[in-house]
């Protein structure tokens, strides 16, 4: 005769942090482990979701993600170089798409076909047509698609001390009058775009040995 005791009886989780059994957790895989993808590596505040795999066509990015995974979770993540392998991994419930935008539509549709829910970085797709295909796939396969417009759900929308919902209601109420003047400035922390775009006569460079350029390019013409 034996007795099964709950894990919390042994004080496995301290304080008020609630323990969630692995069988009750959703699992997540990240495609693209560059800057944005690596930020997704730190989504560990909710015990109901667990990162299990990462994918990248850049060996340096992938190795860094695996290293950070061990540091963060104390376990080795499953590594992929082909996104299709991650999408069809039966151990993955949610696919986090953090690749260049020319891949978003194709990956999202295939993830739906594979029975996965999707968390996709901005922009959703490059074109309206691609976006419509994603919507069709989500509806056809009954999946959940979430676009990462996360500032709309922050407690302080761009430092205004509130979420975007009451601001939207305020504008729609007409209390501020019409028309409104909207002033836009460069986003802090993304100034590299100002120096990278619009350059001419760039010197061709060889493809880095650690990068699978054909897979990175995918459906893009160049």
Locations of the language-model features?
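N-terminal glycine-/serine-/threonine-rich beta1-alpha1-beta2 phosphate-ribose binding loop
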Residues: 1-120, 129-144
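Extracellular structured ligand-interaction cores
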Residues: 25, 49, 179-181, 213
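Short, flexible loop/turn elements at secondary-structure junctions
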Residues: 35, 92, 101, 124, ...
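Flexible, glycine-rich phosphate/dinucleotide-binding loops
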Residues: 37, 60-61, 154, 188-191, ...
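Residues embedded in well-ordered beta-strands within globular domains across many folds
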Residues: 53-55, 96, 180-183, 217
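A contiguous active-site-proximal alpha/beta segment in oxidoreductase catalytic domains
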Residues: 125-210
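Glycine-rich, aromatic-lined ligand/substrate-binding cores of catalytic
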Residues: 204-222
């Amino acid at each position: 005769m034996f007795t099964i005791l709950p894990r919390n009886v042994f004080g496995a989780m301290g304080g008020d942090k609630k323990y969630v059994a692995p069988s009750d957790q959703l699992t997540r895989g990240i495609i693209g482990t560059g800057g944005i993808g690596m930020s997704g590596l730190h989504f560990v505040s909710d015990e109901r979701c667990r990162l299990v795999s990462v994918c990248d066509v850049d060996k340096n990015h992938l190795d860094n993600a695996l290293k950070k995974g061990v540091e963060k979770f104390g376990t080795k993540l499953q590594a992929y170089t082909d996104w299709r392998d991650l999408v069809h991994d039966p151990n993955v419930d949610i696919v986090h798409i953090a690749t260049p935008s020319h891949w978003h539509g194709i990956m999202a549709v295939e993830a739906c076909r594979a029975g996965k829910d999707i968390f996709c970085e901005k922009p959703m797709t490059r074109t309206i047509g691609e976006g419509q295909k994603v919507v069709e796939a989500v509806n056809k396969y009954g999946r959940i698609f979430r676009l990462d417009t996360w500032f709309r759900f922050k407690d302080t929308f761009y430092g205004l001390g509130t979420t975007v919902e009451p601001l939207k209601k305020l504008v729609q109420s007409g209390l501020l009058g019409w028309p409104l003047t909207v002033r836009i400035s460069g986003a802090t922390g993304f100034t590299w775009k100002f120096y990278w775009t619009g350059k001419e006569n760039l010197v061709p460079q060889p493809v880095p040995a650690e990068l699978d350029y054909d897979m990175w390019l995918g459906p893009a013409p160049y």
